[in-house]
């Protein structure tokens, strides 16, 4: 019996896979629990259309991320903070301050996608990575200066 999985099933397959199982397993467990549907020609056609639409949507999201990366690649930030006499920062500069500076420049970026590798605790030049998409990221240089 050929079925289309509606969710991941351990030791069988992943969501939207077309797999062959024994009739009893399909009719008595997978289909009644909603984990699968029978792979009729119409169901296969609907699956193909759904996958095509999803691929188109993911492509659009990736293009939007690439456009945003193109805007951000030439951006250089300057972050002013309170500094002690020795040049160390009170606290640290994090992705929150970087997101705020980007917003001041007109780029709305969620702070959760900004990665700062090391703790920024001194005045100097650093780099942050903005992960816009799983395949698209951009490195933004920023400088921390005394206020």
Swiss-Prot record:
One of its GO terms (molecular function) is structural constituent of ribosome. PROSITE patterns: RIBOSOMAL_L9 (PS00651). Keywords: Ribonucleoprotein, Ribosomal protein, RNA-binding, rRNA-binding. GO terms for biological process: translation. The keyword Ribonucleoprotein applies. Pfam families: Ribosomal_L9_C (PF03948), Ribosomal_L9_N (PF01281). The keyword RNA-binding applies. SUPFAM superfamilies: L9 N-domain-like (SSF55658), Ribosomal protein L9 C-domain (SSF55653). InterPro entries: Ribosomal_bL9, Ribosomal_bL9/RNase_H1_N, Ribosomal_bL9_bac/chp, Ribosomal_bL9_C, Ribosomal_bL9_C_sf, Ribosomal_bL9_N, Ribosomal_bL9_N_sf. GO terms for cellular component: ribonucleoprotein complex; ribosome. Binds to the 23S rRNA. Belongs to the bacterial ribosomal protein bL9 family. This is Large ribosomal subunit protein bL9. The gene is rplI.
């Amino acid at each position: 019996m050929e079925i289309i999985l509606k969710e991941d099933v351990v030791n069988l397959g992943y969501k939207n896979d077309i797999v062959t199982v024994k009739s009893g397993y399909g009719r008595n467990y997978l289909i009644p629990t909603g984990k699968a549907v029978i792979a009729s020609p119409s169901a296969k056609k609907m699956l193909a259309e759904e996958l095509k639409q999803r691929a188109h949507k993911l492509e659009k999201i990736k293009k939007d991320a690439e456009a945003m990366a193109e805007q951000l690649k030439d951006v250089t930030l300057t972050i002013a903070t309170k500094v002690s006499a020795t040049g160390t920062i009170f606290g640290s500069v994090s992705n929150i301050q970087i997101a705020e500076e980007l917003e001041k420049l007109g780029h709305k970026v969620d702070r959760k996608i900004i990665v700062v590798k090391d703790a920024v605790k001194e005045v100097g030049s650093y780099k942050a990575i903005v992960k816009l998409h799983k395949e698209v990221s951009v490195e933004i240089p920023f400088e921390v200066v005394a206020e």
